Amino acid sequence: MPMSPDPRPGRDGASTKPTVAFAHLGCEKNRVDTEHMLGLLSEAGYGVSSDESVANVVVVNTCSFIQEAREESVRTLVGLAEQGKELIIAGCLAQHFQEELLESLPEAKAIVGTGDYQHIVEVLERVEAGERVNRVSSTPTFVADERLPRHRTTGEAVAYLKVAEGCDYRCAFCIIPHLRGNQRSRPIESIVAEAHQLAAEGVKELILISQITTNYGLDLYGRPRLADLLQALGDVEIPWIRVHYAYPTGLTNEVISAYRDVPNVLPYLDLPLQHSHPDVLRAMNRPWQADVNERLLDQIRSQLPEAVLRTTLIVGFPGETQEQFEHLAGFLERQQFDHVGVFTFSPEQGTAAAELPNPVDADIALARKDRLMTLQQPISAAANARWVGRTVDALIEQHNPETGAMIGRCARFAPEVDGEVHIAPRADGLQAAPGTMIPVQITGSDIYDLRAEIVGAASMVASARSAL
């Protein structure tokens, strides 16, 4: 978590209360929850830090999405316990296992559920008074808005904005609805207000997230209103607005038109398709998706010729035959996605898929994953190569101290999951500061990243001065 290791004082300018350390695990939705807890504690006068050595109490915001994530969360907790830290366990693992964590970890002084992190100050005060606290609602109902304090942990120019919490779908492999409850959308006015706040903080890229962002508004307005939300965000002075987690059946003509017509909405579509074969999708409890996958992708490319397409896939789902896997491999080769993530199936206790017969051998699942990733590499390389020669905006995020090169991203790359743009240093040593956006010309490419050079000295000087 990119936060200063030095204790951050509360808003009164001095840490009159103890410093609390934070460890963040899991997805960007979890990150936003962490940022709200940081903001609440800071406002209450606590110091906050990512350096566990400066604090006796550590809040660990955990992940419980798949077995690997649970194991990482438990390793983190045990490691901190071995250091003698008092633990406040928040997030999905706390929601999932609740009292079991308190019983198995004496160092755990509190557990805080996914719908209860807004009470973190009260929880900490009770811990300081000697209580062991269980603050986990059986059914999460809370959703934060722009009024809840927030201390961002991303770089200055990038922010995630959670437009809804929870999920109404029940995909057979997914534990999230059990951990985060049903969908609760925020009003459009609330989201736009927070977007304006973030713009005032210097944010250049705003990433809209939820469990299924294309379902935004269905619970609140009686129909999905992502298109209306994107239109409203068109008036916010943030140059890049990116949408993550678009369920394919929710990409209506109205939504695709908003991608096309709202100038600051990037034509970047994150589509977690999971599979292509109708029988596998039916077993995943996504039966309607098989009828729309290819038709939808054709429609997107027709209406958004510059669309950048990312998807995630699951291999080794119970009962997946070699023939069904070959169907998926053919789909991947045919559709030529820009970016692809592939996961092997992880059985999650409490999900329908965990009880399905005919599990796929782990070695076979891993081999299928490797084959898809190998198949995708030349596709991604060719997609990147098509950008060579273009002049694009790049958001600078860091400098390479050894070479002087600037490292950033263009619109085709989302943070963390996609590639980077490596911008050659100028002979005069002039650099754009992190958080600034500059025009660059793409000069080279590989499977994952692009290489570029700066376009025009005047723009560089302006960017450098704007950062002073």
Swiss-Prot record:
Keyword terms of this UniProt record: 4Fe-4S, Cytoplasm, Iron, Iron-sulfur, Metal-binding, S-adenosyl-L-methionine, Transferase
Catalytic activity: L-aspartate(89)-[ribosomal protein uS12]-hydrogen + (sulfur carrier)-SH + AH2 + 2 S-adenosyl-L-methionine = 3-methylsulfanyl-L-aspartate(89)-[ribosomal protein uS12]-hydrogen + (sulfur carrier)-H + 5'-deoxyadenosine + L-methionine + A + S-adenosyl-L-homocysteine + 2 H(+)
Single GO molecular function: protein methylthiotransferase activity
Annotated positions binding [4Fe-4S] cluster 2: 167, 171, 174
Residue ranges of every copy of the MTTase N-terminal domain listed in the record: 18-129
PROSITE patterns: MTTASE_N, MTTASE_RADICAL, RADICAL_SAM, TRAM
Domain named TRAM: residues: 385-456
Co-factor(s): [4Fe-4S] cluster
SUPFAM superfamilies referenced in this protein's UniProt entry, alphabetically: Radical SAM enzymes
GO cellular component terms attached to this protein's record: cytosol
InterPro entries to which the protein is assigned, alphabetical: Elp3/MiaA/NifB-like_rSAM, Methylthiotransferase, Methylthiotransferase_CS, Methylthiotransferase_N, Methylthiotransferase_N_sf, NA-bd_OB-fold, Ribosomal_uS12_MeSTrfase_RimO, rSAM
Protein origin, superkingdom: Bacteria
EC code(s) of this entry: 2.8.4.4
Domain Radical SAM core positions: 153-382
Subcellular location: Cytoplasm
UniProt remark on cofactor binding: Binds 2 [4Fe-4S] clusters. One cluster is coordinated with 3 cysteines and an exchangeable S-adenosyl-L-methionine.
Statement: the UniProt record of this protein carries the keyword Ligase: no
EC category name: transferase
GO biological process, one term: tRNA modification
Binding positions ([4Fe-4S] cluster 1): 27, 63, 92
Classification via NCBIfam families: 30S ribosomal protein S12 methylthiotransferase RimO, MiaB/RimO family radical SAM methylthiotransferase
PANTHER family with a match to the protein in the record: RIBOSOMAL PROTEIN S12 METHYLTHIOTRANSFERASE RIMO, RIBOSOMAL PROTEIN US12 METHYLTHIOTRANSFERASE RIMO
Function: Catalyzes the methylthiolation of an aspartic acid residue of ribosomal protein uS12.
Family: Belongs to the methylthiotransferase family. RimO subfamily.
Annotated protein name in UniProt: Ribosomal protein uS12 methylthiotransferase RimO
Organismal lineage: Bacteria, Bacillati, Cyanobacteriota, Cyanophyceae, Synechococcales
Encoding gene (name): rimO
